[in-house]
Amino acid sequence: MKKILAYRFSAFGDVAMIVPVLKEFLAQNPDTEIVFVSRKNFADLFDGVERLTFRGVNLDDYKGVFGLRKLTKELNKEYNPKYVADLHDVLRSKILTILFKLRRKKTATLDKGRTEKKQLTRKENKIKKPLKPTTERYADVFRKLGFTLKLSHQLIPKSQQKSGIGFAPFAQHEGKMLPIEKSLDLVKVLSQKNEVLLFGGGKKEVDVLSKWEQELDNVTSLAGKLSLKEELKKIAELEVMISMDSANMHLASLVGTRVVSVWGATHYFAGFLGYGQSENDIVEIKNLECRPCSVFGNKPCYRGDYACLNQIEISEILKKIE
């Protein structure tokens, strides 16, 4: 068995995108096994993947260069990998990769395409074209290590019994979120004919979604009530998930559930559409010259009006569902 050590420590959605790549890699390379190193709370994302060992770490235990030397020593002693795949390409992971290279491991590192992404999101003279999907960038790391991998880009449903509509109205940044009033209006319409399950996390989100649950029939908030494993099971059973450009889109992709995705300041051209999801299920304002203004939606709107989100009509989302 050829043993590969791979790592990425954040963010949640980015780590979730790795899972289908690893599944297809292991299926196509039966003589390999993977040890995946990440934050402990991401473990359930990798549950049930054959020939994959998840190694959770608390990064506070491995601070600075000396801490990373300690982690390298531990991982090498526990697993003695022949190959090392850096799926993060940040300072911490770069140091780890150098330390493994000094131990004569064959290493490869993610190419994030930073220059192309800057060209896509800059204010003037944008180069607006589809960039390589992030999942293909992850796959390239394994190809650089000398393995073959052809991604299917297909959804694989985890549940045959599908019913209800999921809705995850929140995202990490304002530039990725429908105005909350529009989201509430959408739930009001959807719940007239469908069971609607609401997803979110954090106290503020839990409070908002609990209020909607109390006010509306056919609406259940699951925010703050489930473990990650339980949440994935629920999402797998949905007929469709409505999500912003957020981790929920990637969780649904992981369990083979169709996603109608809403895009504001960010753009799927940057390569972050959920694995196996269709561009036909994207809701966006297409002809805004200012869009995309950032890769992650974390920059304030320089126009000041968030037209990319405020101009979206809920009827456009409903059309995709019907």
Locations of regions flagged by a protein language model:
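Catalytic machinery of carbohydrate-active enzymes
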Residues: M1-E322
